[in-house]
């Protein structure tokens, strides 16, 4: 490659550029970009390590007045009929005491308790009846099972007796069986056709 004359001049330019960039970096370190001068002064005067707290004020510079609701002010309701049972005395839970006279309240309670006890008693009697019905069904099922077992045992015994009776008779009647077979083969009875698959 042929040497060019512009090389030394480029070195001079780059040196100037380097000096400018270093100057800019120094100034940027001291002053953050994008912040107004007034804000920069405040930041330099602020205590290190803590964020500044600003008081929230309205446009006029006055504090906001609190608005109270009707419930908080205890304003009485006008033209409202409140039943005695629903009226809630201050400091007490709603709906706990409806009757002023304790004797009448006890009378009401006894009536309600009697009704509930009657329901409970009826439930208990119903449960007892159902239990008796279940017991009767179970006994009946057991009786049926016993009868079936007895019938089964009787049949077994009957079959055993038949075998015992027929066993000695078979030994003496060999000639009779042979005659019966011959008579079948003579042509009176048709021989069954046997078909095998396989």
Swiss-Prot record:
Xref: InterPro entries: Loc1 (IPR037650)
Domain of life: Eukaryota
Record flagged with keyword Coiled coil: yes
Alphabetized GO MF terms: mRNA binding
Record GO cellular component, one term: preribosome, large subunit precursor
Membrane-spanning parts: none
Localization annotation: Nucleus, Nucleolus
GO terms (BP aspect): intracellular mRNA localization; mRNA transport; ribosomal large subunit biogenesis
Chain residue ranges for the region called Disordered: 1-70, 127-198
Coiled coil: 115-135
Biased composition (Basic and acidic residues): 127-157
Basic residues: compositionally biased ranges: 54-66, 158-167, 181-198
Keywords noted in UniProt: Coiled coil, mRNA transport, Nucleus, Ribosome biogenesis, Transport
Function: Required for efficient assembly and nuclear export of the 60S ribosomal subunit.
Family note: Belongs to the LOC1 family.
The protein, known as: 60S ribosomal subunit assembly/export protein LOC1
